[in-house]
């Protein structure tokens, strides 16, 4: 074997072969097509060495086993037949591993995902570490695919069909103890003894196949299987709304393997993989994956980042508490919270405690780790402990004079290099920095709620913000586990600007008599996780509508909302889920009761509530306004690229990922079709639908947003 091989064979003195996996020049092990020859050469040596007692596959990387297959391989396939051949080659390689005459053990530390888990499943036994970095799963569905190297066939036979369906249909990842309980691994050990434990397991004679739990055995029988698959199909269809063809194919392939045997199952798996690889949904989902990977590598500016050793936070409310948690518990940075009273500080501390305690209860971390992370967060009602903070995040009320005061106080009480980052959602960063002594160190850092769940942040430099300030802020966002996009300092920034007309139109249709549930269902059918009216309830009607006057003042009537309707709702003390009354009614806190539309909402706004528009018409009216505004943002350079615009919409507001984001979706529709549709809607509903200049120009020139070699492989 050459020194550049990703798979290195070493035979120990005790006649156990250790195959170390180490992809040269990469931080993470991924499976590439060219590795097949390397693996086959090693398997040949193993078969020929009659003295061997066993084989151990183990990673030489610090914190990952195999994170999956290199997705770029799929992009090189010209048709379904080529992708199917790729899957069959993977299946054959895994079959050769499984057919080895001696015990084969996968020793797993870190991420074992996709093709990595399929390789581990081909081994006779699996053993993993108890480290928090160790996760096992088959996430191919998130790319519009299914596991193509035998995963759909081996996993159900190992852990049972219901557990396998749960893992493969949603790409669920199991931690070490969960994997042990499910029967996915045979043992969990500390990392320090992983190799020796795997070697000892390899020396044993092959153990009998694990007996599945009674429930799984019943479900594997003809009657149980028929009932299970009928229920799973129904539940999956309700969840995906038919927008994700991979889920239906996953169910088909697993059922085929169980009903007709593994040979038929492998054949069905390969064919389905090939067909899914060519679907527009998979191409779009892969594009989102590549774009998000690129964004995470983007430093934000050409300047090197400044020091980032500790962070301050002003305000211990909902946002401040969430920001403190991601900074300390994900970023590992010491955090000092300042609030005007101890109640605010205690709220922020409890916020982190609750999240960490949930992890302890679920056995994701130990109590000692919880205490260690919580110790990174401290608080004060003054600026003690702030003098050495490298960056201070302001999360106080949306009040310009107050935020300007915060800038002055930070400049007075912190170091000369300290960056001031405002979490404002609507106020111009330039205005916040207007009186600053060091305006080059003032920037916007807009988080989305709930902070611990939403992956996106907007980084907003104003005209005088330095390149180093941008780079340092982007670096912080990445440490917090966020995906940052840099956007211009214009009203609404990017995400709220494209979201506002979408929600406004939903409210406008409500005033025309359309029913709440019909509007929401139409946009869920289109592919959004929740409908626009439910989203407004979730965000808070008072909070969600606060930005509308700002946008209307900046951009004119196209941002005007039915003001009398919003006022009537707010005057009736309807804030949404947070006070149990919005467009929907909510049960008592903690109850699982299904939310219901409050029929009083129709009387409140003076309509009958009888839907006349089709679901397609409802979705078109909302989505077209969002797309038109996104194109304006591109034209005005609010976003730096179509890539950032797509990621911002998918990660910030749940734009359907199977469409690739608003810009890929507009490219798919074509600029000519976009302009024609907007003109038709403008004739029906008014000038707010007038196509923007950017789209008109692109239609005339037959241009697209994704150009200059930007492909679904992120080149």
Swiss-Prot record:
Q: Which InterPro entries match?
A: 3-OHacyl-CoA_DH_CS, 3-OHacyl-CoA_DH_NAD-bd, 3HC_DH_C, 6-PGluconate_DH-like_C_sf, ClpP/crotonase-like_dom_sf, Enoyl-CoA_hydra/iso, FA_oxidation_alpha_subunit, FadJ
Where, per UniProt, does this protein localize? Answer: Cytoplasm
Which CDD domains does the protein's record reference? crotonase-like (cd06558)
* UniProt cross-references to Pfam families, sorted A to Z: 3HCDH, 3HCDH_N, ECH_1
Source taxon at top rank:
Bacteria
What keywords does the record list, in alphabetical order?
A: Cytoplasm, Fatty acid metabolism, Isomerase, Lipid degradation, Lipid metabolism, Lyase, Multifunctional enzyme, NAD, Oxidoreductase
According to its UniProt record, which reaction does this protein catalyse? a (3S)-3-hydroxyacyl-CoA = a (2E)-enoyl-CoA + H2O; a 4-saturated-(3S)-3-hydroxyacyl-CoA = a (3E)-enoyl-CoA + H2O; a (3S)-3-hydroxyacyl-CoA + NAD(+) = a 3-oxoacyl-CoA + NADH + H(+); (3S)-3-hydroxybutanoyl-CoA = (3R)-3-hydroxybutanoyl-CoA
Gene3D superfamilies, per the entry: 1.10.1040.50, 2-enoyl-CoA Hydratase, Chain A, domain 1, NAD(P)-binding Rossmann-like Domain
Coiled coil residues, start to end: none
Molecular-function GO terms, alphabetical: 3-hydroxybutyryl-CoA epimerase activity; enoyl-CoA hydratase activity; long-chain-3-hydroxyacyl-CoA dehydrogenase activity; NAD+ binding
Q: What is its EC number?
A: 4.2.1.17, 5.1.2.3, 1.1.1.35
Q: What is its main location?
A: cytoplasm
Residues under site feature: Important for catalytic activity: 118, 140
* Any Gene Ontology biological process: fatty acid beta-oxidation
- Annotated region 3-hydroxyacyl-CoA dehydrogenase: where? 306-715
Pathway field: Lipid metabolism; fatty acid beta-oxidation
Q: Using the UniProt annotation, give all residue ranges assigned to the region (Enoyl-CoA hydratase).
A: 1-190
GO cellular-component term (any): cytoplasm
Return the similarity comment: In the N-terminal section; belongs to the enoyl-CoA hydratase/isomerase family.
State the PANTHER family in the record: TRIFUNCTIONAL ENZYME SUBUNIT ALPHA (PTHR43612), TRIFUNCTIONAL ENZYME SUBUNIT ALPHA, MITOCHONDRIAL (PTHR43612:SF3)
State the oligomer form and interacting partners: Heterotetramer of two alpha chains (FadJ) and two beta chains (FadI).
- Database matches in NCBIfam families: FadJ (TIGR02440), PRK11154.1 (NF008363)
Q: What is this protein's function per UniProt?
A: Catalyzes the formation of a hydroxyacyl-CoA by addition of water on enoyl-CoA. Also exhibits 3-hydroxyacyl-CoA epimerase and 3-hydroxyacyl-CoA dehydrogenase activities.
Name of the molecule in the record: Fatty acid oxidation complex subunit alpha
Species whose genome carries this gene: Salmonella paratyphi A (strain AKU_12601)
Q: Which gene encodes it?
A: fadJ
């Amino acid at each position: 074997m050459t020194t550049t091989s990703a798979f290195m064979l070493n035979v120990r003195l005790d006649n156990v072969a250790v195959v170390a996996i180490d992809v040269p020049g990469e931080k993470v092990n991924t499976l590439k097509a060219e590795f097949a020859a390397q693996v086959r050469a090693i398997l040949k040596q193993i078969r020929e060495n009659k003295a061997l007692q066993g084989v151990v596959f183990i990673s030489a990387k610090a914190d990952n086993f195999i994170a999956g297959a290199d997705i770029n391989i799929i992009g090189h396939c010209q048709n379904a037949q080529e992708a199917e051949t790729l899957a069959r080659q993977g299946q054959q390689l895994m079959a050769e591993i499984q057919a080895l005459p001696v015990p084969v053990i996968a020793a797993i530390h870190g991420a074992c995902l996709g093709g990595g888990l399929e390789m581990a499943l081909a081994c006779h036994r699996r053993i993993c570490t108890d480290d928090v970095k160790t996760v096992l799963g088959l996430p191919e569905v998130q790319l519009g695919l299914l596991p193509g190297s035998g995963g759909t066939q081996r996993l159900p036979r190992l852990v049972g069909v219901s557990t396998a369906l749960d893992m493969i249909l949603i790409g669920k990842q199991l931690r070490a103890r969960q994997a042990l309980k499910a029967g996915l691994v045979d043992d969990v050990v500390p990392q320090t003894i992983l190799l020796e434990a795997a070697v000892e397991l390899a020396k044993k004679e092959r153990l009998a196949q694990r007996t599945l739990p009674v429930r799984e055995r019943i479900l594997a029988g003809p009657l149980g299987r028929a009932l299970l698959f009928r229920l799973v199909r129904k539940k999956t269809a309700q969840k995906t709304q038919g927008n994700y063809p991979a889920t239906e194919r996953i169910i088909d392939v697993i059922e085929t393997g169980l009903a007709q045997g593994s040979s038929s199952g492998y054949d069905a798996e390969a064919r389905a993989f090939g067909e899914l690889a060519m679907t527009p949904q998979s191409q779009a989902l892969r594009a989102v994956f590549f774009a998000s990977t690129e964004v995470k590598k983007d430093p934000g500016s050409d300047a090197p980042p400044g020091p980032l050793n500790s962070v301050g936070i002003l305000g211990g409310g909902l946002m401040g508490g969430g920001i403190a948690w991601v900074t300390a518990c994900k970023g590992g940075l010491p955090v000092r919270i300042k609030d005007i009273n101890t109640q605010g500080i205690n709220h922020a501390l409890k916020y982190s405690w609750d999240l960490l305690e949930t992890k302890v209860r679920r056995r994701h971390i130990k109590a000692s780790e919880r205490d260690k992370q919580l110790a990174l967060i401290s608080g004060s009602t003054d600026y003690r402990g702030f003098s050495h903070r490298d960056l201070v995040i302001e999360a106080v009320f949306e009040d310009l004079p107050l935020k300007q005061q915060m800038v002055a106080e930070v400049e007075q009480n912190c170091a000369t290099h300290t960056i001031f980052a405002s979490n404002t959602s609507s106020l111009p960063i330039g205005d916040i920095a207007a009186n600053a002594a060091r305006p080059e160190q003032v920037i916007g850092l807009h988080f989305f709620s709930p902070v611990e769940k939403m992956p996106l942040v907007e980084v907003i430099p104003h005209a005088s913000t330095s390149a180093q300030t941008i780079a340092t802020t982007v670096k912080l966002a990445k440490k917090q586990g966020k995906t940052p996009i840099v956007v211009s300092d214009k009203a609404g920034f990017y995400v709220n600007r494209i979201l506002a007309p979408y929600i406004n139109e939903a409210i406008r249709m409500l005033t025309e008599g359309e029913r709440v549930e019909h509007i929401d269902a139409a946009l869920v059918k289109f592919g959004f996780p929740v409908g626009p009216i439910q989203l407004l309830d979730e965000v808070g009607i008072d909070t969600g509508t606060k930005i509308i006057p700002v946008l209307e003042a900046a951009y004119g009537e196209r941002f005007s909302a039915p003001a009398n309707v919003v006022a009537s709702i707010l005057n009736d003390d309807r804030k949404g889920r947070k006070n149990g009354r919005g467009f929907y009614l909510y049960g008592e806190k903690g109850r699982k009761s299904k939310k219901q539309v409050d029929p009083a909402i129709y009387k409140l706004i003076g309509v009958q509530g009888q839907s006349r528009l089709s679901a397609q018409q409802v979705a078109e009216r909302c989505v077209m306004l969002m797309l038109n505004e996104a194109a304006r943002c591109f034209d005005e350079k609010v976003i730096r690229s179509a890539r950032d615009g797509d990621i911002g919409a998918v990660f910030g507001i749940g734009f359907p990922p199977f469409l690739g984001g608003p810009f890929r979706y507009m490219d798919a529709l074509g600029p000519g079709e976009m302009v024609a549709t907007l003109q038709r809607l403008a004739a029906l509903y008014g000038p707010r639908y007038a196509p923007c200049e950017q789209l008109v120009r692109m239609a005339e020139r037959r241009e697209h947003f994704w150009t200059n070699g930007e492909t679904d492989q992120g080149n």
